[in-house]
Amino acid sequence: MGFRHKDIIALKDLTKEEITLLLDTADSLSEINRRDIKKVPTLRGKTVINLFYEASTRTRTSFEIAAKRLSADAVNITASTSSVVKGETLSDTANNLLAMKPDIIVMRHAVSGAHEYLAKRVSCSVINAGDGAHEHPSQGLLDMLTMRQKFGKLDGLKVAIIGDITHSRVARSDIYGLTTMGSHVFLAGPPTMMPVGIERLGNVTVCKDMREAVDKADVVMMLRIQLERQGKTLLPSMREYSRYFGLNPEVLGLAKKNAIVMHPGPINRGVELASSVADCDQSAILAQVENGVAVRMAMLYHVCGGEPVE
């Protein structure tokens, strides 16, 4: 089966077969990242523009590395050093970039839906690197790849996602992707950070407290508080948040013995995650970062029309 989409905007738009194809391709391409010479000519002659309106370390760097390992030319643009600071609109930015004939625009934007707006106005492919509190599809894919590598499957897994669900685009992509693949997602967080009706997104259970969500979980995914997306104070204090929704060794002990701990980063140590847990043998956080390069290679490959990789 080939990949039928010009763009990758949201995991909500992808079928189980399409997600499996992307994960299988990422698994195959991950071998390149372990070579002495980490480069193949697959996308030679292609141009990838990384257009970031928000700060990023892991996502932007790994998209750039992914493009270069496939021999594409990667150009990085940040809003703070572009004509955006002079008042240029997204539409005008897109038209000017399109005039330079790129093959793919990878964009991160603070406004939910910005990528759909962009994709309708450009002929090249668009990949969503995060839009507001909507979705972060590459993070969702790399999270699923990390889980699949550990457990050999996604179907039937119990995945606990803890934290600021309302403002987290990672939570939404994980929920869409995992429920499509047959996992059961359990959510916990402060009531002020739990969107009403989120259980309607799929096989999702909203728990009254963190311990209920973590109990017998295969995966414990911790999320940071998205202070930059909150218009008002939603917590009495970080100390109180950590007391009720921070993952420490005692709470982790409620999960299955072979459970893994995950976090999309950046970590706020001592708030949502104790350092002793972040650095323990069950932590898969750095495996997530490593898998991010392979997943983004797969995304670039398939929007350029790549065939399934054996």
Swiss-Prot record:
<dbReference type="Pfam" id="PF02729">
    <property type="entry name" value="OTCace_N"/>
</dbReference>
<dbReference type="GO" id="GO:0004070">
    <property type="term" value="F:aspartate carbamoyltransferase activity"/>
</dbReference>
<comment type="subunit">
    <text>Heterododecamer (2C3:3R2) of six catalytic PyrB chains organized as two trimers (C3), and six regulatory PyrI chains organized as three dimers (R2).</text>
</comment>
<dbReference type="InterPro" id="IPR002082">
    <property type="entry name" value="Asp_carbamoyltransf"/>
</dbReference>
<feature type="binding site">
    <location>
        <position position="136"/>
    </location>
    <ligand>
        <name>carbamoyl phosphate</name>
    </ligand>
</feature>
<keyword id="KW-0665">Pyrimidine biosynthesis</keyword>
<comment type="pathway">
    <text>Pyrimidine metabolism; UMP biosynthesis via de novo pathway; (S)-dihydroorotate from bicarbonate: step 2/3.</text>
</comment>
<protein>
    <recommendedName>
        <fullName>Aspartate carbamoyltransferase catalytic subunit</fullName>
        <ecNumber>2.1.3.2</ecNumber>
    </recommendedName>
</protein>
<dbReference type="InterPro" id="IPR006130">
    <property type="entry name" value="Asp/Orn_carbamoylTrfase"/>
</dbReference>
<dbReference type="GO" id="GO:0005829">
    <property type="term" value="C:cytosol"/>
</dbReference>
<dbReference type="InterPro" id="IPR006132">
    <property type="entry name" value="Asp/Orn_carbamoyltranf_P-bd"/>
</dbReference>
<keyword id="KW-0808">Transferase</keyword>
<dbReference type="GO" id="GO:0044205">
    <property type="term" value="P:'de novo' UMP biosynthetic process"/>
</dbReference>
<dbReference type="GO" id="GO:0006207">
    <property type="term" value="P:'de novo' pyrimidine nucleobase biosynthetic process"/>
</dbReference>
<feature type="binding site">
    <location>
        <position position="58"/>
    </location>
    <ligand>
        <name>carbamoyl phosphate</name>
    </ligand>
</feature>
<feature type="binding site">
    <location>
        <position position="59"/>
    </location>
    <ligand>
        <name>carbamoyl phosphate</name>
    </ligand>
</feature>
<feature type="binding site">
    <location>
        <position position="108"/>
    </location>
    <ligand>
        <name>carbamoyl phosphate</name>
    </ligand>
</feature>
<dbReference type="InterPro" id="IPR036901">
    <property type="entry name" value="Asp/Orn_carbamoylTrfase_sf"/>
</dbReference>
<dbReference type="GO" id="GO:0006520">
    <property type="term" value="P:amino acid metabolic process"/>
</dbReference>
<feature type="binding site">
    <location>
        <position position="265"/>
    </location>
    <ligand>
        <name>carbamoyl phosphate</name>
    </ligand>
</feature>
<dbReference type="GO" id="GO:0016597">
    <property type="term" value="F:amino acid binding"/>
</dbReference>
<comment type="similarity">
    <text>Belongs to the aspartate/ornithine carbamoyltransferase superfamily. ATCase family.</text>
</comment>
<feature type="binding site">
    <location>
        <position position="169"/>
    </location>
    <ligand>
        <name>L-aspartate</name>
    </ligand>
</feature>
<feature type="binding site">
    <location>
        <position position="266"/>
    </location>
    <ligand>
        <name>carbamoyl phosphate</name>
    </ligand>
</feature>
<dbReference type="InterPro" id="IPR006131">
    <property type="entry name" value="Asp_carbamoyltransf_Asp/Orn-bd"/>
</dbReference>
<feature type="binding site">
    <location>
        <position position="139"/>
    </location>
    <ligand>
        <name>carbamoyl phosphate</name>
    </ligand>
</feature>
<dbReference type="Pfam" id="PF00185">
    <property type="entry name" value="OTCace"/>
</dbReference>
<comment type="function">
    <text>Catalyzes the condensation of carbamoyl phosphate and aspartate to form carbamoyl aspartate and inorganic phosphate, the committed step in the de novo pyrimidine nucleotide biosynthesis pathway.</text>
</comment>
<feature type="binding site">
    <location>
        <position position="86"/>
    </location>
    <ligand>
        <name>L-aspartate</name>
    </ligand>
</feature>
<feature type="binding site">
    <location>
        <position position="224"/>
    </location>
    <ligand>
        <name>L-aspartate</name>
    </ligand>
</feature>
